[in-house]
Regions:
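Helix-to-loop junctions at the C-terminal end of transmembrane segments
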Residues: 30-42, 129-130
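Structural signature of the two symmetry-related core transmembrane helices
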Residues: 45-60, 142
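Intrinsic disorder in cytosolic terminal tails and internal cytosolic loops
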Residues: 155-187
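Short amphipathic helix-loop junctions that connect adjacent transmembrane helices
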Residues: 1-15
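Residue-level signature of mid-helix packing/kink "hotspots" within the transmembrane helices
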Residues: 24-32, 118-119
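Intracellular juxtamembrane helix-capping segments at the cytosolic ends
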Residues: 84-99
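A membrane-interface helix-boundary motif in multi-pass transporters
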Residues: 127-145
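Loop-to-transmembrane helix entry/capping segments in MFS-fold secondary transporters
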Residues: 13-14, 98-110
Length: 187
């Protein structure tokens, strides 16, 4: 829906390409510094931080029509830095609580959840965009990331992080298959 949003705010074909390139490259490059931090700081803190960062940055896009293109693309990159590493952070955090023989099953569950989200998400986003216009895309993302951050704060009060089971962060694409996880020598 990023390209649909960009087209809806009247970006040219080249500008839409820049927008999509920045989303992908900034998100990919942010995996390493965010992963490095999450190996040294409680992953929940990092997850909550990037959730609220993504939520807050989403609000800037409500005013995208009034921004110069350069500023719009900078905010796009910052949003992507906060948003794209969330899947890998969540997998690493989950693995902190699992035994090695449980990792493949958990990864399969993540695959199913991503699939469900990929089906349901566009229905909600399109509804927001239909009702609110192009800004509905980022208003939806503002709400989703804000709720994730609040859920993370709530969960921090429910259990502590087990230091002895902590796993290393690995940047993972969202579409990794359970078969790929079976190649993990730990399992």
């Amino acid at each position: 829906y990023g390209a649909i949003y960009a087209s809806s705010i009247n970006l040219s074909l080249f500008e839409i390409s820049l927008y999509m390139m920045i989303i992908t490259s900034a998100g990919a490059l942010s995996q390493w510094p965010i992963g490095y931090l999450s190996d040294r700081i409680d992953r929940r803190v990092i997850l909550i931080g990037v959730s609220f960062m993504a939520s807050g940055l989403s609000l800037f896009f409500v005013f995208a029509n009034f921004m110069p293109l350069t500023l719009f693309l900078i905010f796009t990159g910052l949003f992507s830095v906060a948003c794209l590493p969330m899947y890998s952070l969540t997998v690493a955090h989950t693995n902190d609580f699992l035994q090695p023989n449980e990792i493949v099953s958990a990864s399969a569950t993540f695959g199913i959840l991503i699939g469900i989200g990929s089906i349901i998400g566009p229905l909600f986003v399109s509804t927001f965009m239909e009702i609110l216009g192009a800004v509905g895309f980022y208003i939806y993302l503002f709400l989703i990331h804000g709720l994730l951050g609040l859920f993370g704060l709530y969960r921090m009060t429910q259990r502590t992080k087990p230091r002895d089971l902590e796993s290393q962060y690995n940047p993972l694409p969202r579409n990794i298959s359970p078969a790929g996880m079976e190649m993990n020598p730990v399992t």
